[in-house]
């Protein structure tokens, strides 16, 4: 099938806050003399809903894949059956990513690609004689305004049920009064078939309570989630119902101050943000489901309804996200840890809308560091590889001529002057590395290889006289401080992570048979390690610059210290933890490595306690304060700084649970056919178990203490994979050994301490 020749639109006028332009309907009727199979290619700048003879056939919701159309234009394909006689194609267009004034803080309101929604479509079928026919988007299509008067991807919708056009997409409808569509300029981006998983509704939630307030009726759905609400109401003509979404309450009402945008526009934004508005036509039961937006929320304040209408059945929360397969899981005998695993999964999926976003209620942006930090635990738990591969194309396309990357992808151009740097840009290498490690995928590394080389060269132009780098964001969101007030010096985190990128790039270049590039990357790694050791490590005390948990843990994790130095360096890390009374004191970069370092030195009990303890700051404290998803910030209770209450970039604890507690260590030397089992039998647990579905098959590890305090370990390993079972200090198998070649089976383990 060929890509459609032309894009069409209702007009060039696009929706703004000041001038609402309704979402257009487009339709095309045509005749065939027999039933036939047909293929449809469709894309849109904006979102589309596709109908054939009145039936919605769109794959999922919020189609097509979100991208910068100057870089990439994604299309979808459908197989349909045409009836003999008249057939009707109907398309409903929303503004989507390419016209969202609600994204003004990231310059999406001034994007070069900003335009009215438009679409391109081609339907092909073969007649009885074998001749091919094509129904294509052109000026013969008819268009009319829909009842959707305003739609913004980030903010919400305004829908007027009184303006509905019954049968607009069906056979026999009279569209003679509709105007003809007009041609739209072709986007310049590469046209690609979308292979990422679609977004769709995955669950329906009924409210756990409905409470009358001064402002309306508060619906509480019991969990922080993402999606839309379906409104079912028997309303009066002209009755206007507003749905205001929020993830936390202030004075008993949803409060959106925690997701404020630019203060100079806040009064205007507040009229729209997280609000859907429906006006009733008053002719019986009416059902409204927003089509071209989504929200992050737990609570919905419904205003404009009567007490009789305020029933549980009025509103249903529809959870939406990319349709990612379940690939892993963890559980244990501690309910706090189990709850944190559930919270991590909820944050992961409710922030996965084609690609990992930072949060579903504020930005909905593809922040690069967030994805890099979460890549391992997401690949352990979810089948995200197809979506990651598509997003990597967008990252490569977004790279500028100098080799720099923006902090968000896709972008309108925002994110080069601020919001990037090595910790964020590492996604270019981290994702291909993890995709090879967990899925055996080298195609992603091949796709990114030219961009990786370009990026490494770019970093060499940004080094100071000491070969150090300090060009981006650092250890973001430390406890109790402003997000940018990190203790670990930027030169430390940037240079250490650049060294790690060079190491992983060299590994991938070796796999791709690119020896010159691998040698170049290794030389950079040595250079950056030497610079950190010379200028940012005190070799007398074995303390890293900043004298903080993040610097010390990162220096150990990323092998800045030499083997003979690691014990002394770790002792300093323990001292730093003791100074904080065994609380974590890290931002997101330190949080990614701290607990793994503790486990590597036999301190999994301490790591578990730091994670699950109920007092501030800790993950367990979030639970004590009612969290159902991971939060953006560790702030004390009562703080004015709340931040997002649904962020996934702290979620590597899920990886730690699987790797440290159940012991599943995928690809310990980088190879996807290898797995080690190294469980930590920590004192607070009586059992722990996890699984991961690898390309070869299911991998699992489960252990429990029996009545004699013997630990029974059960391992499940595909026959095509290999590895070892390695016990931590103080434990042996029944034969007295602490190390075995891994095989599926059950093992009895004894303590020797």
For the regions a language model picked out, list residue spans one by one.
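Short helix-capping and inter-helix turn/linker motifs at the boundaries of alpha-helical repeat units
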Residues: 18-20, 221, 365, 422-423, ...
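Alpha-helical support elements that line or immediately flank enzyme active sites
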Residues: 39-42, 228-247, 292, 303, ...
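Active-site acid/base region of carbohydrate-active enzymes
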Residues: 47, 138-140, 144-145, 299, ...
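Helix-terminus loop motifs that line ligand-binding clefts
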Residues: 58-70, 253-270, 385-481, 487, ...
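C-terminal capping/lid segments that line or modulate ligand- or cofactor-binding pockets
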Residues: 159-160, 363, 381, 427-429, ...
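Extracellular/oxidizing-compartment recognition motifs
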Residues: 1-362, 370, 386-389, 406-413, ...
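Non-catalytic C-terminal accessory modules of carbohydrate-active enzymes
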Residues: 111, 115-122, 133-167, 192-197, ...
């Amino acid at each position: 099938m060929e890509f459609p020749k032309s894009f069409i639109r209702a007009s060039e006028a696009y929706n703004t806050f000041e001038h609402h332009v309704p979402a257009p309907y487009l339709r095309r009727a045509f005749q065939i003399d027999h039933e036939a199979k047909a293929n449809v290619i469709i894309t849109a700048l904006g979102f589309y809903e596709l109908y054939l003879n009145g039936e919605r056939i769109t794959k999922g919701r919020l189609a097509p894949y979100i991208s910068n159309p100057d870089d990439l234009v994604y299309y979808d394909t459908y197989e349909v059956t045409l009836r003999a006689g008249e057939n009707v194609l109907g398309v409903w267009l929303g503004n989507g990513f390419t016209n969202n004034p609600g994204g003004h803080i990231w310059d999406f309101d001034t994007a070069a690609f900003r335009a009215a929604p438009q679409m391109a479509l081609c339907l092909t079928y073969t007649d009885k004689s074998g001749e091919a026919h094509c129904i294509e988007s052109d000026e013969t299509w008819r268009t009319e305004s829909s009842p959707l008067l305003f739609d913004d991807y980030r903010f919400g919708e305004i829908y007027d049920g009184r303006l509905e056009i019954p049968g607009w997409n069906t056979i026999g409808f009279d569209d003679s009064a509709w105007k003809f569509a007009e041609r739209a300029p072709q986007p310049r981006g590469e046209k690609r078939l979308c292979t990422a998983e679609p977004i769709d509704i995955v669950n329906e939630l009924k409210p756990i309570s409905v409470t009358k307030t001064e402002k309306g009726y508060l619906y509480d759905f019991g969990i922080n989630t993402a999606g839309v609400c379906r409104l079912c109401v028997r309303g009066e003509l002209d009755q206007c119902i507003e749905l205001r979404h929020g993830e936390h309450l202030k004075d008993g009402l949803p409060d959106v101050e925690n997701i404020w945008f630019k203060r100079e526009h806040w009064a205007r934004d507040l009229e729209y943000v997280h609000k859907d508005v429906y006006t009733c036509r008053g002719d019986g039961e009416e059902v409204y489901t927003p089509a071209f937006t989504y929200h992050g929320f737990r609570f919905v304040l419904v205003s404009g309804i009567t007490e009789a209408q305020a029933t549980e059945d009025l509103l249903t929360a529809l959870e939406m996200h990319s349709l990612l397969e379940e690939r892993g899981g963890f559980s244990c005998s501690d309910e706090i840890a189990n709850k944190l695993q559930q919270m991590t999964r909820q944050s992961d999926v409710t922030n996965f809308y084609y690609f990992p976003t930072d949060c579903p209620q504020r930005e909905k942006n593809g922040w690069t560091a967030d994805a890099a930090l979460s890549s391992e635990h997401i690949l352990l738990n979810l089948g995200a590889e197809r979506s990651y591969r598509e997003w990597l194309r967008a990252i490569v396309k977004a790279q500028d001529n100098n080799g720099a990357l923006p902090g968000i992808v896709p972008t309108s151009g925002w994110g080069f002057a601020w919001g990037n740097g090595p910790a964020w840009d590492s996604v270019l290498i981290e994702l291909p590395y993890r995709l090879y490690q967990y899925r055996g995928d080298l195609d992603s590394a091949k796709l990114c290889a030219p961009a990786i080389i370009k990026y490494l060269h770019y970093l060499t132009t940004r080094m100071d006289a000491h070969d150090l780098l300090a060009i981006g964001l650092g250890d973001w969101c430390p406890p109790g401080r402003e997000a940018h007030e990190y203790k670990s010096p930027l030169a430390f985190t940037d240079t250490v992570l650049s060294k790690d990128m060079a190491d992983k790039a060299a590994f991938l270049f070796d796999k791709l048979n690119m020896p010159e590039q691998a040698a170049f990357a290794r030389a950079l790694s040595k250079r950056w390690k030497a610079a950190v050791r010379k200028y940012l490590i005190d070799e007398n005390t074995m303390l890293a610059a900043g004298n903080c948990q993040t610097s010390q843990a990162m220096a150990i994790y990323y092998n800045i210290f030499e083997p003979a130095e690691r014990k002394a360096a770790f002792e300093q890390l323990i001292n730093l933890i003791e100074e904080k009374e065994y609380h974590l004191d890290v931002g997101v970069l330190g949080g990614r490595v701290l607990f793994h370092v503790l486990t590597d030195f036999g301190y999994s009990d301490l790591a578990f306690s730091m994670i699950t303890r109920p007092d501030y700051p800790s993950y367990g404290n979030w639970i004590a304060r009612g969290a159902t998803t991971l939060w953006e910030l560790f702030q004390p209770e009562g703080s004015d700084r709340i931040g997002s209450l649904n962020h996934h970039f702290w979620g590597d604890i899920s990886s730690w649970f699987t790797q440290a507690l159940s012991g599943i260590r995928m690809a310990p030397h980088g190879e996807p056919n290898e797995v080690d089992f190294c469980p930590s039998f920590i004192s607070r647990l009586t059992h722990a178990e996890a699984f991961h579905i690898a390309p070869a098959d299911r991998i699992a590890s489960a252990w429990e203490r029996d009545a004699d305090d013997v630990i029974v370990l059960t391992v499940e390993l595909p026959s095509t994979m290999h590895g070892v079972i390695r016990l931590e200090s103080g434990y042996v198998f029944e034969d007295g050994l602490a190390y075995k070649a891994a095989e599926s089976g059950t093992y009895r383990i004894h303590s020797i301490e």
